[in-house]
From Swiss-Prot:
<comment type="function">
    <text>This protein is one of the two subunits of integration host factor, a specific DNA-binding protein that functions in genetic recombination as well as in transcriptional and translational control.</text>
</comment>
<dbReference type="GO" id="GO:0003677">
    <property type="term" value="F:DNA binding"/>
</dbReference>
<dbReference type="Pfam" id="PF00216">
    <property type="entry name" value="Bac_DNA_binding"/>
</dbReference>
<dbReference type="InterPro" id="IPR005684">
    <property type="entry name" value="IHF_alpha"/>
</dbReference>
<dbReference type="GO" id="GO:0006310">
    <property type="term" value="P:DNA recombination"/>
</dbReference>
<keyword id="KW-0805">Transcription regulation</keyword>
<keyword id="KW-0804">Transcription</keyword>
<keyword id="KW-0238">DNA-binding</keyword>
<comment type="similarity">
    <text>Belongs to the bacterial histone-like protein family.</text>
</comment>
<dbReference type="GO" id="GO:0005829">
    <property type="term" value="C:cytosol"/>
</dbReference>
<dbReference type="GO" id="GO:0006417">
    <property type="term" value="P:regulation of translation"/>
</dbReference>
<dbReference type="InterPro" id="IPR010992">
    <property type="entry name" value="IHF-like_DNA-bd_dom_sf"/>
</dbReference>
<protein>
    <recommendedName>
        <fullName>Integration host factor subunit alpha</fullName>
    </recommendedName>
</protein>
<keyword id="KW-0810">Translation regulation</keyword>
<dbReference type="GO" id="GO:0006355">
    <property type="term" value="P:regulation of DNA-templated transcription"/>
</dbReference>
<dbReference type="InterPro" id="IPR000119">
    <property type="entry name" value="Hist_DNA-bd"/>
</dbReference>
<comment type="subunit">
    <text>Heterodimer of an alpha and a beta chain.</text>
</comment>
Amino acid sequence: MTGRTVTRADLASAVCRKVGLSYTESAALVELILSEISDSLVKGEMVKLSCFATFQVRSKSRRIGRNPKTGIEAPIPPRRVVTFKAANILKQRILDVHCAKQK
């Protein structure tokens, strides 16, 4: 694991290099795609990107949690969370790279 974080600027640079758009156009395209994904999730829609992953908003019910330092129980209110489920193709690619590095 490299510990490197890929940012929006990195994505825009990659689009610029690989597609041939200007950096400004590439950055706008990345923002548009991320905005569409965000808007869909806010509306409660599932976002499925074939061969990559599925993003989905799901509801978590109220539950009792515990403060790990004090051990005191505290209620955790119901909330909505975003889940990410990697596609099998992506999982396999990651596994293949990991196995190749082990050799």
